[in-house]
């Protein structure tokens, strides 16, 4: 009859790890996902990444976490079931899921492959609800059911345990660099910070055929930046002489420092006319701009990427052998891992071995 709503079939039993409240205490959480629809893909989760965003969401830092909360916006696994109208995947395929599991599909952003800017997104990690009334729980769980449009093809030669952080750190740095044209050969890009975001930014810059200069607070990271990640140069951000010599030489800089602590005038001074400062380190306070003219330089931010960009990140990583430095952990180590993230004690990202350590029992 007109006006009636179809009751959603929430019959897929699932177990995940998350929080029941803002105390931050992590625990197993049982819940139900919807039965696969015609265009849905059912995924056995094998790996799930953990980052600072997850830690802050667990503690409701921004005030919009809905409990019980199962985190996870960097998820990799294999297809175990497909709906009858699914065209992109078959059982056994390796796949990934990023931060989005749905969007309106009608707005300007959705129509232009920028689903991440949709005003009505369905996020993977439990911060939103579907139109039908289904709660979305994150990928730190044994199973996911996702519309095939929001499922990513996983390249065969990209290890899932080393690649799963690309679904966060990778797309966060790739999307704005591509937008600014920094994916072209010959660009000189400065990277502030050499953590999870910075290390991936350097690898992508080199894959693009560019020159990467790492600017860090610690001289101890010089060997690591050059020998492990392929940076062309390294500068300590307190070395005024070196910084002076670099003024106006860079096509852009990417600030990946936690909390966006790098002074804006310092970054603007390094950038050429028409260059750009890209902020991906989630600034926690307002930044100050210099009063003098900025030479038509741009300051931009980033909010992950669209689905096309997500797939490009995985494909480029596979083509250029880009992997993340991950510490693979079991689910029982998760609380310790969150504390280590809080204390900046991880090199560089955690990947949870969901497939072998998260057991589902009826």
Curated annotation (Swiss-Prot):
For this protein, the record's InterPro entries field holds: ADH-like_C, ADH-like_N, ADH_Zn_CS, CAD-like, GroES-like_sf, NAD(P)-bd_dom_sf
Where does the chain bind Zn(2+) 1?
51, 73, 168
Catalytic class of the enzyme: oxidoreductase
Q: Which Cys-Cys disulfides exist here? A: none
Q: Where along the chain is Zn(2+) 2 bound?
A: 104, 107, 110, 118
Cofactor binding note from Swiss-Prot or TrEMBL? Binds 2 Zn(2+) ions per subunit.
Residues the record lists as binding substrate: 73
Q: Which GO terms describe its biological process?
A: alkaloid metabolic process
- Give the family, as the similarity comment puts it: Belongs to the zinc-containing alcohol dehydrogenase family. Class-III subfamily.
**Subunit note:** Homodimer.
Protein's recorded name = Alcohol dehydrogenase 13
The record lists the organism as Catharanthus roseus
Q: What is the lineage of its organism?
A: Eukaryota, Viridiplantae, Streptophyta, Embryophyta, Tracheophyta
The record's gene field reads ADH13
